[in-house]
A protein has these predicted regions:
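Intrinsically disordered terminal and processing segments
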Residues: 169-216
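Dual-mode signal for accessory low-complexity, basic/Gly-rich regions
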Residues: 95-96, 111-174
């Protein structure tokens, strides 16, 4: 990873690409994600909350960054997400050989399909839920984060830290959203990466079949 892939990116270019994307987020609050595989998701965001500093530039004392860096992300407004989400790239630290289908109502995953991997997901999140108070248990299924990969050298290889940074992908994380200001404090946070998605913010298309349609 340190000599090729996402770590080999020109992070000045990554920073520029993320900065150029920022103006397209202004005053847009409805996100719609679709794919040919069946994803059809709509949710709201507070456009002022987009995180645009995961760019790999870490040149001042006490600055922190992901390795590899390169994503733009936000917390979906709680309770607003509805639809079907098909994860087809990777989940956590595994490349997928079978898609995962998530049914989402009011920001909460209510059903998971997709063979063995889906059964494992249900078990893992179920075990975490058992440790919570009964009124908090469904919060483990909160859709906690949404973002775009912005690193043109990142590759899809089953390492979630790199997979979610691959340019043209988007990702959704399930579980704890407190790091982004949310109320779901559940101690689990796992991302799934989509390839080939179409994404709109209000009536402005951002991704078409996994490629940016904007000049960034």
């Amino acid at each position: 990873m340190f000599t090729h892939g996402g770590m080999a990116a020109d992070f000045n270019n990554v920073k520029k690409r993320i900065s150029n994307l920022g103006p397209h987020f202004r005053r847009r609050r409805i996100v719609n994600v679709k794919s040919k595989l069946g994803t059809e998701i709509t949710f709201e965001v507070n456009w002022r909350e987009w995180k645009l500093d995961d760019n790999g530039i870490c040149n001042r004392p006490r600055m922190l960054t992901n390795l590899p860096a390169g994503k733009a992300f936000i917390m979906p407004r709680e309770g607003t997400m509805n639809g079907t989400l098909i994860i087809n790239g990777s989940w956590d630290s595994s490349l997928l050989d079978q898609n995962i289908e998530l049914q989402i109502e009011n920001g909460i995953v209510i059903d998971v399909k997709g063979g063995t991997i889906a059964a494992n997901i249900r078990q893992e999140f179920g075990e975490v839920a058992k440790k919570l108070r009964s009124k908090d248990r469904e919060n483990v299924w909160t859709v906690a984060e949404f973002g775009f990969g912005m690193n043109d050298q990142a590759r899809m290889g089953g390492n979630v830290l790199e997979d979610e940074k691959r340019l043209g992908t988007c990702y959704f994380s399930i579980g704890d959203n407190t790091a982004l200001g949310g109320s779901s404090a559940v101690g689990i946070h796992i991302p799934g990466v989509l390839t080939g998605a179409n994404v709109w913010l209000d009536d402005s298309q951002i991704l078409q079949d996994g490629e940016f349609v904007l000049d960034i």
